[in-house]
């Protein structure tokens, strides 16, 4: 019996499910799943607020879990699926962990380090290159983020209005 090979879209849907967990925790909704040999070895969603940890990005959480599962920080041939283009910190962690590929959904024009703002993953000064596949379920990934930030702006506006009416 042969093993089923799951598609980029399949794994990105899994990452989107994890991103919704971040939303439920009132964190920026980014999710990540780390896959090695067609098997999940790490999962994560943004948790820096709840964990009081600026490094608790979805990608870092998934890489940490993957290292524990593999009993090695070198995650050679692993693929990281993430709903948003990685930041500089996460791109650096991907290089140090030696993953083979990152697959992301939405681009991040403000802090994206996989081609939007800069390309850390292919920088000639780095000792490892990570292959990049982008745009998988990009519209769904971007919509989740847009909806979240729209909701947050509305909440802030309502709080300010309530505060000004009590002053």
Curated annotation (Swiss-Prot):
Active site positions, chain numbering: 59
Residues where Zn(2+) binds: 57, 87, 90
CDD domains listed in its UniProt record: nucleoside_deaminase
Pfam family, one: MafB19-deam
Phenotype when the gene is knocked out: Mutation makes E.coli resistant to the toxic proteins encoded by the gef gene family.
Cofactor info, note text: Binds 1 zinc ion per subunit.
Entry-linked PROSITE patterns: CYT_DCMP_DEAMINASES_1 (PS00903), CYT_DCMP_DEAMINASES_2 (PS51747)
Every CMP/dCMP-type deaminase domain range: 6-117
GO annotation, biological process: adenosine to inosine editing; tRNA wobble adenosine to inosine editing
Keywords, ordered alphabetically: Hydrolase, Metal-binding, tRNA processing, Zinc
Cofactor dependency: Zn(2+)
Gene Ontology MF: a single term: protein homodimerization activity
TM segment ranges: none
Enzyme Commission number(s) from the entry: 3.5.4.33
Annotated signal peptide: none
Source organism superkingdom: Bacteria
Catalytic reaction(s) noted: adenosine(34) in tRNA + H2O + H(+) = inosine(34) in tRNA + NH4(+)
Enzyme class: hydrolase
Role, per record: Catalyzes the deamination of adenosine to inosine at the wobble position 34 of tRNA(Arg2). Essential for cell viability.
Record's subunit section: Homodimer.
PANTHER family, A to Z: CYTOSINE DEAMINASE FAMILY MEMBER (PTHR11079), TRNA-SPECIFIC ADENOSINE DEAMINASE (PTHR11079:SF202)
Similarity comment: Belongs to the cytidine and deoxycytidylate deaminase family.
Protein name: tRNA-specific adenosine deaminase
Organism listed in the record: Escherichia coli (strain K12)
Species lineage: Bacteria, Pseudomonadati, Pseudomonadota, Gammaproteobacteria, Enterobacterales
Gene for this chain: tadA
């Amino acid at each position: 019996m042969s093993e089923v090979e799951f598609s980029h879209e399949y794994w990105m849907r899994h990452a989107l499910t994890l991103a919704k967990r971040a939303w439920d925790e009132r964190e920026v909704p980014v999710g990540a799943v780390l896959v090695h040999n067609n098997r999940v070895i790490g999962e994560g969603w943004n948790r820096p607020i709840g964990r009081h940890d600026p490094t608790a990005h979805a990608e870092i959480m998934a890489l940490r879990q993957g290292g524990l599962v593999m009993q090695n920080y070198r995650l050679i041939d692993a693929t990281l699926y993430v709903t948003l283009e990685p930041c500089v910190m996460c791109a650096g962690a991907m290089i140090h962990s030696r993953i083979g590929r990152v697959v992301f959904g939405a681009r991040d024009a403000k802090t994206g380090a996989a081609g939007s703002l800069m390309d850390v993953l292919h920088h000639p000064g780095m000792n490892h290159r990570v292959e990049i596949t982008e745009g998988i379920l990009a519209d769904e990934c971007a919509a989740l983020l847009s909806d979240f930030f729209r909701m947050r702006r509305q909440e802030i506006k309502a709080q300010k209005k309530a505060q000004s009416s009590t002053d």
